[in-house]
From Swiss-Prot:
<keyword id="KW-0325">Glycoprotein</keyword>
<feature type="topological domain" description="Extracellular">
    <location>
        <begin position="451"/>
        <end position="481"/>
    </location>
</feature>
<dbReference type="GO" id="GO:0050658">
    <property type="term" value="P:RNA transport"/>
</dbReference>
<feature type="region of interest" description="Involved in dsRNA-binding">
    <location>
        <begin position="22"/>
        <end position="312"/>
    </location>
</feature>
<keyword id="KW-0694">RNA-binding</keyword>
<feature type="glycosylation site" description="N-linked (GlcNAc...) asparagine">
    <location>
        <position position="20"/>
    </location>
</feature>
<dbReference type="InterPro" id="IPR025958">
    <property type="entry name" value="SID1_TM_fam"/>
</dbReference>
<dbReference type="Pfam" id="PF13965">
    <property type="entry name" value="SID-1_RNA_chan"/>
</dbReference>
<protein>
    <recommendedName>
        <fullName>Systemic RNA interference defective protein 1</fullName>
    </recommendedName>
</protein>
<feature type="transmembrane region" description="Helical">
    <location>
        <begin position="692"/>
        <end position="712"/>
    </location>
</feature>
<feature type="transmembrane region" description="Helical">
    <location>
        <begin position="430"/>
        <end position="450"/>
    </location>
</feature>
<feature type="topological domain" description="Extracellular">
    <location>
        <begin position="532"/>
        <end position="543"/>
    </location>
</feature>
<dbReference type="GO" id="GO:0035194">
    <property type="term" value="P:regulatory ncRNA-mediated post-transcriptional gene silencing"/>
</dbReference>
<feature type="topological domain" description="Cytoplasmic">
    <location>
        <begin position="621"/>
        <end position="633"/>
    </location>
</feature>
<feature type="topological domain" description="Extracellular">
    <location>
        <begin position="18"/>
        <end position="319"/>
    </location>
</feature>
<feature type="topological domain" description="Cytoplasmic">
    <location>
        <begin position="763"/>
        <end position="776"/>
    </location>
</feature>
<dbReference type="GO" id="GO:0016020">
    <property type="term" value="C:membrane"/>
</dbReference>
Length: 776
C-alpha cells in the first residue's frame, strides 16, 4: 500500500507541468494492478466511472485561492447496488483530502434499519494561510500556486464496480452570515431545508467579532433525526483524538425537535474560531422509534437562532436564592429561643435529681383524669416537681435503680432519680451510626465521577442529560445552576439538626411522660439531608441513569427513617440497629439493580422482595396493635393494595425506568404511612399543636409547588439523548433558574417543613403518661 501511494505522489508531481485532461494516465505497478489518475474540473458536479478489478482510481482537482473558506462535500455512490446485496463488509473505499483535512468513506453504510450504498462528508475548508507566506516565501504573489483535492477509489472485490462521485462546493457566503452588525446580538435563520445529502455549515470567528459567549438554538417541527457538530476551525469534523492529554472541543449532539449548545468564555478564549455543522441522518432509529420518514433523503426544515452573549455573573441570582432560603430560618428563630428558655426553666437545681413530696399510699393506684393530667403538666413545667399522683410510676422506677433518703423529722421524703440520658448524650452511640462512613465514600465517588465525565474519552453531550437550554456552566461543570441550588438541602438539614438538639429538653422526663425519645434518629435524618445535597450535586455533574444511583439512596434512606421513627416513637426508642439495617437494605437493593440492570428478570426479583417486605410490615403491624386491629384494618388494606398496584405497574409498564422503581416505592410508602399516622391521631382524638399544623400546611404547600416544577419534564434520561434534548426549555427565573432548579429550592423547603411537622406532631403528648398513650 505504501508503494502504491509513493507512485501516486510521483505521478502527481510530474502532472503539475501538464495541462488538465480527462484522459487517464495509467501507471503500471505490477502485472495484475494499475493506478489510473484523472484530472477533473471544478465545474464537474458528478463524475461517473467504472472501477475495474485490481485498479485504483485517483482523481485530482486543482484548488486556487477562490476556494478559500469554501466547504467541499464529496459523496460516493455505488450505481447498481443490487449486484452486491449478498456481499458482506466494505465494497468500495473512498479517501478524500485537500491537504488541510481528510476523511474516509466506506460503502455500504449500515444503519439499524437501513443499508445505504451512498455516503458523503465535508472537508474543512482551506484558509488564507494555506496560500500565504509562511509556507514558501518565494511563492508570495505567485498566481499559479495552488492546493489539490485528491480522491482515491479502490475496492477489495475482484469485480468491476460502477460508481459515481458528487463533488459540491458550498460557497463561503453562508459563513459570512454569522457576522454580527454593531449592536446586534441575535440572528435567525428560519425553515432552512436540509437533506441527508445536503447538510449546512457555519463559520464563527469569535476573536474578530469580540464574542465572549455564544449560544446556538436549533428547532424543527418536522420528524427528524440529526446531528449538530461543532469543532474548532483547525480540527477535523469527523476525527476525534484518543490522546488523553490532548485538549479538544469537538462536540456531537444528536437531536430531534430541539438542540441547544453554549460556547463558554473559556472555550472561546482557547479555540478562537469554530465551525458549526448540521447533518440529517438517513434513519430515525438513532433518535426515536417513532418515525414518519418515507425515504432516507427527505427534506427537513430546521430554524436557527444565534445569540451573542455578554459575560454573565451568577452573583445576583445566587444571592437572591440565599436570601429566599434563609428567610424561613427567621421563622424558627423564636421557636428555638423559646425552647432554650423552657429547657432552662425545666432544669432542677441538681440536673440528675427529681424531688417530690409523698402522698398517702391509697392514692398511688389512682389513675389521673384528663384534668388532673393538665394540672400535672402545668405543675411540672412551673417547678419541675412530679405530682403525688405519679408516685406509682416513680416508685416502680425507684425499685429498679434508685437511691432513697428519708428525713423522719418532718416526714419529707427525697427520692433521687437519675434522669435517663437520651441517645444523643450517649456519644458512643454516634459511632454505631453509618454516617461517618458514608460521607467520605460519597465524596470520593463524586470526585471520581467528575474525572470520568470530563475525560477526553467521554462524550458528555450524549452521556449527560442536561437541560441545555438553561445550563449555566462554570469551569468544567456544564450546569452550575443545577448544582448550586442543592445548597438548600445542606442549609435545611443543618437547621433541623440544630432544632433537634435544642428540643432535647422535651425528653427530660421521657421515662415517665410523652413518646419515646429519638433525638439521634432526628439528627441522622438531618445528616442524610445534608448528604442528599452532595449526592444531588454529584448527579448533576452528568445526569444519567448511572448517576441517578448517587442521588436516590439518600432519598430512600430519609423516607425509610421517617417511617422507622413514627413506627417506634410510641413503642420504644429506635436503636442504631434500625438505621444500619435500613442502610444495608437500601445499598444492597441499589447494587442489585445496578448489577442486573441489563437482565430481563430483575424486575421480578424486585417484585418478590417488595412482596416480602410489604407482607412482613403488615403482619408486624397487626401483631403489635392488639385490640386496635379494627381501626387500622382499612389502612393495612389500602397499604397492601397501593403496593400491589405499584408492583403491577413497574412489571408491565416500561415507562418506569428500573432505577426509579425503588425510589418511587419508598416515597409512596412514606407518604402513606405519614398520612396513616395523622389520621390515627385524629381518630383517637389527639390534639395536634398549632406549630405542627402550621408546619404541616406549609409542607403541603411547598410540596405542591415543588411537584409542579418537578413534573415540567425538561429532561428525561429514560429516553435517548436526542429525545431528551427535545424537552429542553429556557430558564424560568432571572435567566438562571430552570424548572429543576426551582424543584431543588422548594423541595428542600418542603423537606424541612415535613421534618419539623414529624418532630412536633406529638408535642401534645409530652405530659401524658406512656401507659396512657395510644399505640398505633
Amino acid at each position: 500500500m505504501i508503494r502504491v501511494y509513493l507512485i501516486i505522489l510521483m505521478h502527481l508531481v510530474i502532472g503539475l507541468t501538464q495541462n488538465n485532461s480527462t484522459t487517464p494516465s495509467p501507471i503500471i505497478t505490477s502485472s495484475n494492478s494499475s493506478v489510473l489518475v484523472f484530472e477533473i474540473s471544478s465545474k464537474m458536479k458528478m463524475i461517473e466511472k467504472k472501477l475495474e478489478a485490481n485498479t485504483v482510481h485517483v482523481l485530482r482537482l486543482e484548488l486556487d485561492q477562490s476556494f478559500i473558506l469554501d466547504l467541499t462535500k464529496v459523496a460516493a455512490e455505488i450505481v447498481d447496488s443490487s449486484k452486491y446485496s449478498k456481499e458482506d463488509g466494505v465494497i468500495l473505499e473512498v479517501t478524500v483530502s485537500n491537504g488541510r483535512d481528510s476523511f474516509l468513506l466506506k460503502l455500504p453504510t449500515v444503519y439499524p434499519n437501513l443499508k445505504l450504498y451512498t455516503d458523503g462528508k465535508l472537508l474543512n475548508p482551506l484558509v488564507e494561510q494555506d496560500f500565504g507566506a509562511h509556507r514558501k516565501r518565494h511563492r508570495i504573489g505567485d498566481p499559479h500556486f495552488h492546493q489539490n483535492l485528491i480522491v482515491t477509489v479502490q475496492s477489495r472485490l475482484n469485480a468491476d464496480i460502477d460508481y459515481r462521485l458528487h463533488v459540491t462546493h458550498l460557497d463561503r457566503a453562508q459563513y459570512d452570515f454569522l457576522k454580527f452588525k454593531t449592536g446586534q446580538t441575535t440572528k435567525t435563520l428560519s425553515n432552512q431545508k436540509l437533506t441527508f445529502v445536503k447538510p449546512i455549515g457555519f463559520f464563527l470567528n469569535c476573536s474578530e467579532q469580540n464574542i465572549s459567549q455564544f449560544h446556538v438554538t436549533l428547532y424543527s417541527e418536522d420528524d427528524i433525526c440529526a446531528n449538530l457538530i461543532t469543532v474548532p476551525a483547525n480540527e477535523s469534523i469527523y476525527d476525534r483524538s484518543v490522546i488523553s492529554d490532548k485538549t479538544h472541543n469537538r462536540r456531537v449532539l444528536s437531536f430531534t425537535k430541539r438542540a441547544d449548545i453554549f460556547f463558554t468564555e473559556t472555550e472561546i478564549s482557547m479555540f478562537k474560531s469554530f465551525r458549526i455543522f448540521v447533518f440529517i441522518a438517513p434513519d430515525d432509529s438513532g433518535c426515536s422509534t417513532n418515525t414518519s420518514r418515507k425515504s432516507f433523503n427527505e427534506k427537513k426544515k430546521i430554524s436557527f437562532e444565534f445569540k451573542k452573549l455578554e459575560n454573565q455573573s451568577y452573583a445576583v441570582p445566587t444571592a437572591l436564592m440565599m436570601i429566599f432560603l434563609t428567610t424561613p430560618c427567621l421563622l424558627f428563630l423564636p421557636i428555638v429561643i423559646n425552647i432554650i428558655k423552657n429547657s432552662r426553666k425545666l432544669a432542677p437545681s441538681q440536673s440528675n435529681l427529681i424531688s417530690f413530696s409523698p402522698v398517702p399510699s391509697e392514692q398511688r393506684d389512682m389513675d389521673l383524669s384528663h384534668d388532673e393530667q393538665q394540672n400535672t403538666s402545668s405543675e411540672l413545667e412551673n417547678n419541675g416537681e412530679i405530682p403525688a399522683a405519679e408516685n406509682q410510676i416513680v416508685e416502680e422506677i425507684t425499685a429498679e435503680n434508685q437511691e432513697t433518703s428519708v428525713e423522719e423529722g418532718n416526714r419529707e421524703i427525697q427520692v433521687k432519680i437519675p434522669l435517663k440520658q437520651d441517645s444523643l448524650s450517649l456519644h458512643g452511640q454516634m459511632l454505631q451510626y453509618p454516617v461517618a462512613i458514608i460521607l467520605p465514600v460519597l465524596m470520593h465517588t463524586a470526585i471520581e465521577f467528575h474525572k470520568w465525565t470530563t475525560s477526553t474519552m467521554a462524550n458528555r453531550d450524549e452521556m449527560c442529560f442536561h437541560n441545555h437550554a438553561c445550563a449555566r456552566p462554570l469551569g468544567e461543570l456544564r450546569a452550575w445552576n443545577n448544582i448550586i441550588t442543592n445548597i438548600g438541602y445542606t442549609l435545611y438539614g443543618a437547621i433541623f439538626i440544630v432544632l433537634s438538639i435544642c428540643r432535647r429538653g422535651r425528653h427530660e422526663y421521657s421515662h415517665v411522660f410523652g413518646t419515646y425519645e429519638c433525638t439521634l434518629l432526628d439528627v441522622t435524618i438531618g445528616v442524610f439531608m445534608v448528604l442528599q445535597s452532595i449526592a444531588s450535586a454529584t448527579y448533576h455533574i452528568c445526569p444519567s441513569d448511572v448517576a441517578f444511583q448517587f442521588d436516590t439512596p439518600c432519598i430512600q434512606v430519609i423516607c425509610g427513617l421517617l417511617m422507622v421513627r413514627q413506627w417506634f416513637v410510641r413503642h420504644e426508642s429506635p436503636s442504631p440497629a434500625y438505621t444500619n439495617i435500613l442502610l444495608v437494605g437500601v445499598v444492597s437493593l441499589n447494587f442489585l439493580i445496578s448489577a442486573f440492570s441489563k437482565t430481563s428478570y430483575v424486575r421480578f426479583i424486585i417484585a418478590v422482595i417488595h412482596v416480602i417486605v410489604v407482607g412482613s410490615i403488615c403482619l408486624a403491624k397487626e401483631r403489635s396493635l392488639g385490640s386496635e386491629k379494627l381501626k387500622t384494618r382499612f389502612f393495612i388494606m389500602a397499604f397492601s393494595m397501593g403496593n400491589f398496584a405499584a408492583i403491577v405497574m413497574y412489571l408491565t409498564l416500561s415507562a418506569f425506568h428500573l432505577n426509579q422503581i425503588a425510589t418511587y416505592c419508598f416515597i409512596i410508602n412514606c407518604i402513606m404511612y405519614l398520612m396513616y399516622y395523622g389520621c390515627m391521631k385524629v381518630l383517637h382524638s389527639e390534639r395536634i399543636t398549632s406549630k405542627a399544623k402550621l408546619c404541616g400546611a406549609l409542607s403541603l404547600l411547598a410540596w405542591a409547588v415543588a411537584g409542579f416544577f418537578f413534573f415540567q419534564d425538561d429532561t428525561d434520561w429514560t429516553r435517548s439523548a436526542a429525545a431528551s434534548r427535545a424537552l429542553n426549555k429556557p430558564c424560568l427565573l432571572l435567566g438562571f433558574f430552570g424548572s429543576h432548579d426551582l424543584w431543588h429550592i422548594f423541595g428542600a423547603l418542603a423537606g424541612l417543613f415535613t421534618f419539623i411537622f414529624v418532630s412536633f406532631v406529638d408535642d401534645d403528648l409530652i405530659n401524658t403518661r406512656k401507659t396512657s398513650i395510644n399505640i398505633f
